[in-house]
């Protein structure tokens, strides 16, 4: 929580800066110009290398939008438990999560295609991320951003209904990170022989409904929040070969 707070306060634009690097590549391709390295790509490159070496820890701890999602979900959870006396953590069924996780790839493809075709300029004022960046910079978006404001509000509502709603379902950078080849030493493992019978707490607690040592095609969906490690009664979940 402390790391998330520090990054939210001091580095709220990391997400948008990283995507600006991706965007600059496709803008150069659209203009039939050589791709030139820039400060945006510095951030993009560093985050991609970190993801390959250590997994999606940026998503888990350093993304301001992800931290906002955590805050919205935990606030909703507190209200449910303290006021409405609801037990347990709420969220979508696994089958629904699996379907919605694909939306971010569709959104990424749409954004990149719109850049390549020159249609991206028509999206001016519609980006909820631009609105969020303005707010974290202490600026109020004007009326031209009304669609972006409305979309941000809808995302905030979604954050209340599912843990890591934006990260899992809508984040275009999350889609990029999820497609990166993550080193095996950065993946979570467990010794199944040490697991209590019919436990399954790690998968139940995972926002993405992932099973440790399960379907490796889904390993990119892990946002490295370490919730599985925290809830394991046997401290049986680890990264690397230990």
Predicted ranges, named:
Residues 1-213, 220, 226-242:
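Non-ligating segments of multi-cofactor redox enzymes
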């Amino acid at each position: 929580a402390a790391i998330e707070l520090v990054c939210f306060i001091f580095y709220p634009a990391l997400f948008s800066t990283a995507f600006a690097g991706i965007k600059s590549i496709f803008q150069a391709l659209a203009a039939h110009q050589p791709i030139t390295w820039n400060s945006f790509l510095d951030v993009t490159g560093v985050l991609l290398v970190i993801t390959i070496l250590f997994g999606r820890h940026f998503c888990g701890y350093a993304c301001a939008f992800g931290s906002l999602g955590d805050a919205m979900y935990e606030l909703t959870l507190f209200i449910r438990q303290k006021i409405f006396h609801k037990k347990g953590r709420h969220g979508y069924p696994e089958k629904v999560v699996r379907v919605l996780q694909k939306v971010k790839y569709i959104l990424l493809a749409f954004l990149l295609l719109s850049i390549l075709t020159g249609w991206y300029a028509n999206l001016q004022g519609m980006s909820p991320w631009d609105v969020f960046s303005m707010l974290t910079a202490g600026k109020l978006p004007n009326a031209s951003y009304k669609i972006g404001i409305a979309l941000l509000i809808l995302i905030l509502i979604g954050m209340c209904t599912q843990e890591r709603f934006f990260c899992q379902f809508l984040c275009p950078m999350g889609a990029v990170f999820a497609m990166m080849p993550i080193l095996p030493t950065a993946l979570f493992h467990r010794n199944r022989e040490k697991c209590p019978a019919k436990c399954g707490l790690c998968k139940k607690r995972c926002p993405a409904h992932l099973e440790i040592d399960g379907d490796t095609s889904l390993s990119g969906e892990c946002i490295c929040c370490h919730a599985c490690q925290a809830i394991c009664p046997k401290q049986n979940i680890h990264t690397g070969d230990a």
